[in-house]
Design a protein with these regions (language model features):
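P-loop NTPase Walker A phosphate-binding motif
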Residues: 1-19, 28
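Switch/connector loops and helix/strand junctions flanking conserved nucleotide-binding motifs
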Residues: 5, 31-33, 84, 114-118, ...
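Conserved NTP-binding/hydrolysis module of P-loop NTPases
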Residues: 18-20, 29-48
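Central P-loop NTPase core of STAND/AAA+ ATPases
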Residues: 43-66
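Helix-loop-helix "sensor" segment of P-loop NTPases
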Residues: 44, 64-67, 73, 98, ...
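Conserved Walker B catalytic segment
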Residues: 59-63, 67-108, 120-121
Length: 189
């Protein structure tokens, strides 16, 4: 509802051509399913591989991409749904490196519960590798109006008065500035 998936989609449109991306939106999956999903995103068919083969293939792929001058990015949306075992696999992947640098960048996007999971003592090693945490907040009253006006413009309705002046504060009041709720309310209006 806060716009994190939309933000990821916008980010992916702007990404440089030398970046190889795997985007995962897992339901609750096992560690091996998660690793297989990553390899599938990179063009492999890992379904008959054992876990050791999957990890070796993934590590080799990461090193090959680095040697070819490409960066590798793993984006995991709805990461709050990941089990502790999967988060531990992510920690292990984040440690793959050459003598110069780490070869995998990882973005974990999720609901606020993700922060609670990452703060668990069992995941201290993963948390120590987190370079940045960012929290999307709800829109302000002015941002909500700007957001609605922008969406109307994109929809081709910029010249039409869809909402009266006194409607914008009401939309903000009933939605709290949460983009998904703003969209839902405006779509049903």
């Amino acid at each position: 509802g806060s716009g994190k998936t939309t933000l990821i989609e916008s980010f992916l449109k702007e990404i440089q051509s030398d970046v190889v991306v795997a985007q995962i939106n897992p339901p609750q999956v096992s560690a091996i399913d998660f690793l297989q999903a990553i390899l599938v995103q990179f063009g492999f068919s890992p379904f008959k591989m054992k876990k050791g083969e999957i990890i070796a293939t993934l590590n080799n792929f990461l090193i090959e991409q680095y040697a070819a001058g490409r960066k590798v990015l793993l984006i995991v949306d709805e990461a709050q749904n990941l089990s502790q075992r999967v988060l531990e696999e992510i920690r292990m992947l984040s440690g793959v490196e050459t003598t110069k640098e780490k070869v995998l960048r990882i973005i974990l996007a999720g609901q606020p519960e993700l922060n609670v999971k990452l703060d668990a003592p069992e995941l201290v090693q993963l948390t120590q590798r987190v370079r940045l945490r960012f929290h999307l907040t709800a829109l302000s009253r002015a941002e909500t109006r700007g957001y609605i006006e922008h969406r109307l413009e994109v929809a081709g309705a910029a010249d039409r008065q869809i909402f009266t002046e006194d409607t914008f504060p009401l939309i903000f009041r009933f939605t709290g500035g949460v983009p998904r709720l703003v969209n839902t309310l405006c779509d049903t209006a």
